[in-house]
Design a protein with these regions (language model features):
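N-terminal helix-turn-helix
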Residues: 1-18
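All-alpha effector-binding/dimerization core of bacterial HTH-type transcriptional repressors
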Residues: 22-187
Length: 187
């Protein structure tokens, strides 16, 4: 597992080589982890705050992303993650209600993925992540409170079930001074 995650390299006839130490400032882009899993793995206490949870109907951009008709509706979940009282990221997630028919405040505060996997018995397969940088919006600034910084790191995620069905579209706005993302490249 450590080898497939890119943390060690096994060399035949030799000891394993540690490639990186995973910590909060060095989060892998190659795995899908919940806040609870990250807390346990790194022995930290990231806290999730729910800002809003409501249903969105007939949004043309979302319908195009999810490749669905106008009758489709989605849950919109806006949250922040904090460490020691400092907001590290601001996320906006959309879940297809045909796949995720019910969400409430308790689930959104705890772990949506745990609910999907354990209660709904969905098999989460993979995600596509696009990383870009842009100017911060007033809404994001309200929560991230960047002083002299007007740019943010944006990770746009399309998450799919194991059968290839898109069930979540998310943008996570990261405080640019609080995270370093790492991918181990192999030849």
């Amino acid at each position: 597992m450590l080898e497939t995650e890119g943390f060690i390299q096994k060399v035949k006839g030799k000891k394993s080589i540690v490639l990186e130490k995973k910590n909060l400032e060095n989060i892998s882009l190659t795995s899908i982890q919940t806040v609870q899993e990250l807390n346990k793995l790194q022995n930290i206490n990231l806290e999730t705050d729910l800002i809003s949870l409501y249903i969105v109907q007939g949004d043309k951009k979302l319908m195009k992303k999810f490749q669905v008709s106008e009758s489709a509706d989605f849950y919109k979940v806006v949250r922040t993650n904090s460490l020691n009282g400092e907001v590290l990221n601001y996320s906006t997630s959309f879940f297809d209600r045909k796949i995720v028919p019910f969400l409430n405040e308790e689930i959104a505060k705890k772990s949506i993925y745990e609910y999907l996997e354990k209660d709904l018995k969905l098999k989460i397969g993979y995600s596509r992540r696009d990383i870009n940088f842009r100017k911060i919006t007033p809404e994001e600034q309200k929560y991230l409170k960047l002083k002299d910084i007007n740019m943010v790191v944006v990770i746009e995620t399309h998450a799919y079930l194991s059968n290839g069905t898109l069930f979540q579209y998310e943008t996570i706005i990261h405080h640019p001074e609080k995270f370093t993302f790492t991918v181990i490249a192999k030849r």
